[in-house]
Structure formats: C-alpha cells, structure tokens
C-alpha cells in the first residue's frame, strides 16, 4: 500500500502452493502478466516459489528476473531449477584435464550447480556436460537483464542444438 500499487495480490506459501500454481497458470493463459515478489529477499533463494517458477517454465511461459546484486542469483531465480541447495563454482579451469576433473566431481554432488563461462567456451562446456552427465537438467542464462535475455533449458544436448540454431546465442555474456 505504501508503494501505491493497487494490483491484486495473492499469498503463496507451502500450504497453498498447489492451488495457487494452478490459479496463476490460469491467469497466464488468459494473457495476464504476473509478478512474483517476496518480503524475504530475492524470490526462490531459500524462499517459497520454486514449484511456481518450474510450473510456469514447463507450461512454456517466459520468466524474467528483476536483477539484484548478483548475476548468479538473478539467473538462479528464473532458471526453474531447485534453489534449496545450490553451489556456485564460478569459472571452471581452462585446461581440459582440470576442467573434466571438476565436472566429474559435480556428477554425483547433490544440489544445483551454478557455473560461469565465457562466450568462447560455452559450446565446449555443453559438450563436456553432455558427455559426462547426459541426463542432467541444464539452464543456460545469457544476456541477463538485457534486450536479448535468453534462458535455454533442457539437457546439454538440447541446449547445444538450440545454441547451434541461433548465431545470436554465440555472442554476448
């Protein structure tokens, strides 16, 4: 109220999540725009809402994060992957043997893994993930908060196929 927002607001918590998700999907199918706002920081980072974002993504709707102080949290909040336990690994080593060793260690580690990679090495990273973890859920977040913001979701193989089909994906951050 003190912000002057007069839109309809709904609560979302573990006791009403299933019903709210369906209600929100119905609103989206009617063409309405929805905002997920939290009174506890960035939504989905140790906060309710992951099942909602996953359902919205799986239904084919676009999720656009509002940027915070970190690209990692911005990407994670809209990825549609579990956020109750995640590990940020930063950039992997450039050297192939060290890189494969690090990726092999991630194979059996629990939680969502967040990696940074340069545009010039992203294809190689996806190929290595495809080789070591062909069934892993992958989200490639690029150009966050920019005009060409993109989230590719699927296996590494599926992301590679999408990446190969669009020259714009090979540019930017």
Where are the predicted features?
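Short, acidic/turn-prone active-site loops that include or flank metal/cofactor-
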Residues: 11-18, 69, 90-95, 143-146
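Short hydrophobic/aromatic-enriched beta-strand-loop microsegments
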Residues: 6-13, 63-64, 84-90, 135-141
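Class I S-adenosyl-L-methionine
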Residues: 1-66, 74
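General beta-strand structural signal in soluble alpha/beta enzymes
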Residues: 38, 65-68, 115, 140
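Short, well-ordered secondary-structure micro-motifs
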Residues: 22, 47, 75-77, 99-101, ...
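Class I SAM-dependent methyltransferase SAM-binding "motif I" and its flanking Rossmann-like core
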Residues: 51-109
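A contiguous loop/helix-start segment that scaffolds small-molecule binding in enzyme catalytic cores
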Residues: 32-33, 112, 116-173
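Short, hinge-like loop/turn segments at secondary-structure boundaries
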Residues: 4-7, 26-28, 53-54, 79-84, ...
């Amino acid at each position: 109220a003190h912000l002057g927002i007069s839109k309809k607001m709904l609560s979302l918590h573990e006791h009403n999540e299933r019903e709210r998700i369906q209600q929100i999907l119905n609103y989206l199918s009617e063409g309405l725009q929805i905002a997920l706002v939290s009174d506890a920081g960035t939504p989905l980072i140790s906060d309710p809402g992951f099942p909602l974002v996953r359902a919205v993504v799986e239904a084919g709707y676009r999720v656009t994060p509002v940027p915070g102080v970190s690209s990692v949290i911005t990407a994670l909040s809209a990825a549609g992957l579990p956020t109750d336990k995640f590990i940020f690994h930063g950039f992997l080593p450039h050297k192939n043997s060290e890189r494969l060793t690090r990726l092999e260690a991630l194979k059996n580690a629990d939680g969502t893994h967040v990696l940074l990679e340069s545009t010039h090495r992203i294809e190689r990273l996806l190929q290595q993930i495809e080789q070591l973890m062909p069934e892993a859920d992958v989200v490639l977040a690029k150009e966050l908060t920019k005009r060409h913001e993109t989230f590719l979701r699927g296996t590494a193989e599926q992301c590679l196929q999408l990446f190969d089909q669009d020259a714009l994906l090979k540019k930017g951050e």
